[in-house]
Amino acid sequence: MSKKATEFQRKAMSWMYRGKEIFKPLNTGWIDENVACVREWVANIFFYRKGDTTIMIDAGYNYDRLAEKMSWLGIDPKSIHHILITHQDTDHVGAVEADSPGLFRNAKLYIGEIENRYLTGEVRRRVIYHLYKLPQVTINNEKVLLHDGQVLDIDGVRIECFLVPGHTWGHMVYLVDGKYLFTGDTLWFGADGGYSFISSLAEDNKLAVKSLALLEKKLRKRGLHPLFITGHTGWTDNMEFAFAHKNELCSPFKKRAHDPNALYDAYDESDDTEENSKSGYLKGVGR
């Protein structure tokens, strides 16, 4: 189903969100010496490199140019043995769905136990304020099911799992080596700071807001100040910026939250080039 879902999003969401000043993905490149990203239209997938190990965070769309753009970064798809999945929406799992080209067919997937209930068909994913149910996603890769607070060690990489539900029921956020927090679709960065992610795409907006507040509380209690790396709006190392509007929603059709620096149509990726991917580290926001 991922190829159809990918094509639907490319056409429908391009039209729906054009000019709304919502999506501001990073272009393909490196954030620093450890973290790289590939741009797939409005979305980013990430790679964490430590020694000889490269861990992938989310699997993006069923995207024809993924292997090409990974080559710009010097990353071979065959080197990916572990993929952390924040949630099961098609712009985060497309490359591992059953009808994908199979670039990562041998990789092990790590996904929240609650989120996996979408994959088993126990629950259905609802979007557009619950008006539309998405088709069930099918993934054949080996899976490791995760729980809130679980800590993993993958080839010397420490990964801590935070359950942050709301956008989906089992959305997981990953803290990698205590420094990088991959937030998926829990945070949306506007020009004036972070908001709870796009309201029309959430299972439960009240829960999403509550979950963000709890995440901030956990981080502050432990004195953690990671890089916040989002799925659609870049990254920041400024915690105050990241949680500036945690009690508010990004509501794209009400113009309450927008970013004038966002692309008019983020599905136009003509500026995402190999040359630009090698031109220096990608800049953060809120700095």
Language-model features, listed with the residues they occupy:
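A cross-kingdom feature marking charged/low-complexity
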Residues: S2-A12, E240-P260
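Conserved beta-strand hairpin/beta-sheet module of binuclear metal-dependent hydrolase folds
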Residues: K20-L73, V173-G184, W188-G190
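Hydrophobic/aromatic beta-strand patches that form the interior of the parallel beta-sheet core
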Residues: A36, L84, Y110, V144-L146, ...
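Metallo-beta-lactamase
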Residues: S14-G19, K24-L26, W30, E113-P165, W169-F241, L249-P252, ...
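Active-site HxH/HxHxD metal-binding segment of metal-dependent hydrolases
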Residues: Y63-R65, S71-Q150, N247-A266
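C-terminal regulatory/interaction regions
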Residues: S2-F8, P260-R287
